[in-house]
């Protein structure tokens, strides 16, 4: 019973059937709530009817003065301030805050990656599952968290882009702040793009175009989960290597040759 709330909450967590979400958001707006996380699925990821419902949700939220995370998301965590707006298993085990911010378009993949980041002892300051991004986009959410001085490196999992220009602005802001941005972008081929669209309603983008944009603006692209974890571990250290100089020390001549070949491919000398 939203109207009977004793005062307006700072944040609403909405977990009701999709058919009831819009009415809930309207009622929250009337009560003075200004931010909401929507866990409910059944929107743009389901097809034309779901897209229409999501568009209506966006309209009502904006008319009500509410900013949204989601729908179809797993919420977010601000470990610095002990805020856990999620129903995922993220909060199990050691949840100490750290210098890494991780924003993901996949809730399940994101929570698994977050667990691996924490297993390496890196520490997550922020974890955000964006869902369908009916309102706040991946780039907007990431831009907000990189402004926190406690964050030293930002990482993200992308299935599609809703706003390429916003991603460029994010990259420029990270560069200005001196904070590396590491992205894992899936959907390189048609099958992956189709799967992403059915998952979170993600929009496909030509992979070669995205690669060129990321290189132009200094964004590091992770090939896979393990590659991302290695990058984050290196970049979150107190001292980060500068330049492209590389020394290789190995007991195996063959391994040294392989590493030398790979180093040259990556532009290391």
Where on the chain are the PLM-derived regions?
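Catalytic-core regions of core metabolic enzymes
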Residues: 1-269
């Amino acid at each position: 019973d939203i109207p009977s709330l004793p005062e307006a909450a700072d944040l609403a967590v909405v977990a009701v059937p999709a058919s009831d979400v819009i009415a809930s958001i309207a009622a929250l707006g009337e009560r003075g709530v200004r931010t909401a996380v929507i866990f409910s699925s059944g929107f743009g990821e389901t097809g034309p009817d779901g897209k229409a419902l999501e568009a209506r949700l966006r309209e009502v939220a904006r008319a009500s003065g509410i900013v949204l995370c989601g729908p179809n998301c797993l919420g977010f965590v601000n470990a610095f301030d002990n805020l856990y707006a999620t129903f995922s298993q993220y909060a199990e085990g050691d949840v100490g805050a750290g210098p890494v911010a991780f924003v993901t378009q996949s809730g399940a993949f994101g929570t698994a990656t977050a667990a691996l980041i924490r297993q390496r002892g890196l520490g997550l300051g922020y974890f955000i599952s964006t869902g369908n991004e009916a309102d706040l986009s991946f780039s907007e959410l990431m831009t907000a968290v990189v402004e926190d001085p406690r964050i030293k490196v930002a990482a993200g999992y992308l299935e599609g882009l809703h706003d390429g220009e916003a991603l460029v602005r994010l990259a420029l802001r990270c560069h200005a702040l001196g904070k590396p941005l590491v992205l894992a972008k899936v959907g390189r081929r048609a099958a992956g793009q189709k799967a992403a669209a059915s998952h979170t309603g993600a929009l496909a983008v030509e992979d070669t175009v995205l690669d060129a944009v990321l290189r132009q603006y200094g964004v590091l692209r992770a090939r896979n989960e393990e590659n991302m974890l290695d990058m984050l571990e290196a970049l979150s250290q107190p001292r980060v290597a500068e330049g492209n100089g590389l020394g290789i020390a190995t007991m195996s001549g063959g391994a040294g040759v392989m590493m030398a070949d790979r180093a040259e491919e990556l532009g290391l000398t």
